[in-house]
């Protein structure tokens, strides 16, 4: 097997002139100088490793720029600088014959770029993390102590409260409707529906049935953002970055002391292409106005008991259930006033009402709002029309995939 550095060097540009460092005048000259020195050192005759200290200076300086003001106001140029800093740090870590812990640190650095930076050099950090993953000998700590366990096995936080559905309010189900029928019966009139049968051939159900150990194997060493707290409207709710292995150990198979953790609304499939190969974009998305590249695919992975408060999405949504079950309740946008949205701009798309335990003294009109409900099971795909309100509670360990499209 070739060394880590040999494989990494092979994906870098052959010459310094092919290594782009094009930035606008918004970037400080001192930062550009650091970037140029790091690049030039890489191509020196002595084949010296990139300075780890200089790479960290670039990362730290650009990190400060990323954390000033709101995220949407961050200039993309500084995100690119951050990614270059991460690239140079990875190159400094991997020069020579690094041990396993250093390779894992390099993977984390790549992930930080993928999460916080911007794509550079034809998404080179995504290619590097693929090389590094193949060099990690053990992606699952203590794997010898584990067996291949199905998701269906009862785990921490599995929910004891089973919903009793009202048959008159259940979301309708249909098996593989034609594009024309889906458009005429559900998309145009904005009616929720559960579509059955369209995930039958997904590799996530066939060649690579998703299990705890499978996720550890393909994504265990990857750093991801998780939400800590029962729901994002709680005061104690927070976010942090940990590896998928750590998330599973602490929040899926760990003790109750760790609280509730949720890998929610994260574009995991862009970060881990192996998982993206296990799913398929529903054909019905072609009825939208955008291209396939405009579809946002998010992962939702967590224990039973996780809750997404009653809220609206900014686009049409197909919610596909791969593992476990979820109770979902939907309300029409016509009932928005009766759902008491938060007044703050930050939470204007979220209701103040606890759906399954409403305070009808404080929110008296909530009981007048008409709703539909369902239990989404593995293989089901729920169409949630644009601006529909919906509430979600995981009944057990669950993995869902959402497709936002316009």
From Swiss-Prot:
The keyword Zinc does not apply. It comes from the Eukaryota. It is found in: Nucleus. SUPFAM superfamilies: Clavaminate synthase-like. InterPro entries: ARM_KDM8_N (IPR056520), Cupin_8 (IPR041667), JmjC_dom (IPR003347). Residues 143-162 are annotated as: Disordered. GO terms for cellular component: nucleus. The keyword Transcription regulation applies. GO terms for biological process: circadian regulation of gene expression; G2/M transition of mitotic cell cycle; negative regulation of DNA-templated transcription; positive regulation of DNA-templated transcription. It catalyses: N(6),N(6)-dimethyl-L-lysyl(36)-[histone H3] + 2 2-oxoglutarate + 2 O2 = L-lysyl(36)-[histone H3] + 2 formaldehyde + 2 succinate + 2 CO2. Disulfide bonds: none annotated. Its EC number is 1.14.11.27. Residues 143-152 have a biased composition (Basic and acidic residues). Gene3D superfamilies: Cupin. Its cofactor is Fe(2+). Signal peptide: none annotated. Coiled coil: none annotated. Binds 1 Fe(2+) ion per subunit. Histone demethylase required for G2/M phase cell cycle progression. Specifically demethylates dimethylated 'Lys-36' (H3K36me2) of histone H3, an epigenetic repressive mark, thereby acting as a transcription activator. May play a role in the regulation of the circadian clock. This is Lysine-specific demethylase 8. It comes from Danio rerio (Zebrafish). The lineage of its organism: Eukaryota, Metazoa, Chordata, Craniata, Vertebrata.
């Amino acid at each position: 097997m070739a060394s880590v550095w040999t494989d990494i060097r092979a994906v870098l540009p052959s010459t310094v002139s092919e290594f782009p460092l094009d930035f606008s005048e918004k970037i400080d000259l001192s930062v550009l100088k650091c970037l140029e020195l790091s690049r030039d050192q890489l191509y020196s005759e002595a084949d010296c490793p990139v300075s780890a200290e200089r790479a960290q200076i670039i990362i730290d300086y650009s990190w400060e720029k990323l954390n000033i003001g709101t995220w949407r106001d961050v200039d993309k140029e500084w995100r690119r600088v951050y990614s270059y800093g991460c690239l140079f740090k990875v190159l400094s870590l991997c020069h020579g014959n690094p041990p396993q812990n250093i390779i894992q640190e390099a993977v984390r650095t790549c992930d930080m770029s993928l999460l916080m930076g911007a794509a550079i050099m034809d998404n080179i950090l995504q290619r590097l993390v693929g090389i590094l993953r193949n060099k990690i000998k053990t992606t699952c700590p203590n794997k010898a102590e584990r067996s291949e366990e199905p998701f269906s096995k009862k785990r921490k936080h599995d929910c004891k409260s089973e919903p009793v559905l009202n048959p008159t309010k259940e979301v309708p189900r249909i098996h593989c409707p034609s594009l024309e029928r889906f458009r005429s019966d559900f998309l145009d009139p904005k009616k929720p529906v559960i579509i059955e049968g369209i995930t039958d051939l997904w590799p996530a159900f066939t060649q690579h049935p998703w299990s705890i150990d499978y996720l550890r194997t393909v994504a265990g060493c990857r750093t991801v953002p998780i939400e800590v707290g029962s729901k994002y409207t709680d005061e104690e709710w927070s976010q942090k970055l940990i590896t998928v292995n750590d998330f599973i150990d602490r929040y899926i198979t760990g003790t109750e002391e760790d609280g509730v953790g949720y890998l929610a609304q994260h574009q995991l499939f862009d970060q881990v292409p192996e998982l993206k190969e296990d799913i398929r974009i529903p054909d019905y998305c072609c009825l939208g106005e955008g291209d396939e590249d405009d579809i946002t695919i998010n992962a939702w992975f967590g224990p039973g008991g996780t809750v997404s408060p009653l809220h609206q999405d900014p686009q049409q949504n197909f919610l596909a259930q791969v593992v476990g079950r979820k109770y979902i309740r939907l309300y029409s946008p016509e009932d928005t006033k009766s759902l008491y949205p938060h007044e703050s701009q930050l939470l204007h798309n979220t209701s103040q009402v606890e759906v399954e335990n409403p305070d009808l003294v404080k929110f008296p009109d909530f009981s007048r709002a008409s709703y539909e409900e369902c239990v989404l099971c593995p293989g089901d795909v729920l169409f949630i029309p644009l601006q529909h309100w919906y509430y979600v509670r995981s009944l057990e360990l669950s993995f869902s995939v959402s497709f936002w499209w316009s």
